[in-house]
Amino acid sequence: MRAAARRLIVAGAGLVLLSAIAPSQPALAQAADKVTVRFTWKLKGEYAPLFVALDKGYYKAEGLEVELAEGSGAQTVLKLLASGNEKLGYGPAVSAAQAVSQGLPVKVVALYQTRAPMGVISFPDVPLETPKDLEGKRLAISVGETFGDMLGPFCRINHVDIDKIQRIQMDASARTAQFLTRKVDVLSVYLSNEWPQIEKRAGVKFNVLRVSEFGLNLLGASMIVGNTFAEQNPDTVKKLLRATAKGYRDAIADPKGAAKAMAKYLKVPEDPEVLDRQVEATVVSTNAPPGKPIGWQEAADWEANLTLLKETGAISELKPLSAYYTNDYLQ
């Protein structure tokens, strides 16, 4: 009886000790693993792979509590990453490269598009089969608009006389309306975003010139980190990229399923057909090299893009490649 009582007392003391310790452990883990991925723009179909990872619990399975949040432009998000006010961003690698060249302490840790899905569209009665067809056309140009910034190299590569293109400067918010009302002949778009939306509004099938098929390969979607956060939380970054890659794999295997998963999280509902097309354009452009993790980066891709950015004046100084990207967090 006395021995049994002593065993109960010892066991009880152990339970008290465990109960005193246990509550602090999950609290610490939760605080360390709660992260926000800040998109550089409003929610759209090209973000679907990340919402697949969220919807299927892949982030949770890695011990992460992830919030996927809208942004208000790449420059704003990159500055927040650099200051430490945001930890992870998702947006164009080209924008990250410009930020690094300006001295911001950020880095691309996964590259999901080696060829940004950009295109130029026209109405059916406006011929547009090759870059040469841009000559004699009215093209909408806006400040900070990627294709407009790269028009010079694109024309040079394809032997197009840029002076024969009528470039009409306008506010970015007016571009679509100007195109739909035929004030301009051709409009640059992201095939994974505006193209299906504008085509749905117009009710016609546009002619599409895919710029990557004509030599202009710009790095696209990527995961970007603030350097300090990545250095201090390497395991968190690795877990996030591992779960995101699973979301990408599932989206590639089932684009329509990915669109349905994305639809659950949209504050403003999108037409299902438009969302399907946005996701499809995203997955076909995904960087999934054989034998490498999804998001793996090659030096040659970065060198070519940095040279192009230097040529166009988008960056003034080239830094070592290691300043722009790393594969260290990919598994």
Predicted regions: what is each one?
Residues 94, 174-178, 182-268:
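Pocket-lining segment of extracytoplasmic ligand-binding domains
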Residues 302-331:
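Conserved C-terminal helix/tail region of periplasmic/extracytoplasmic solute-binding proteins
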Residues 16-27:
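C-terminal segment of classical bacterial N-terminal signal peptides
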Residues 1-10:
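N-terminal export leaders
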Residues 30, 231, 330-331:
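Short, solvent-exposed mixed-charge patches
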Residues 162-166, 268-279, 315-323:
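Short, surface-exposed acidic
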Residues 231-312:
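Secondary-structure end/capping motifs
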Residues 29-181, 185-192, 209-211, 217:
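Short, glycine-/small- and polar/acidic-enriched structural segments
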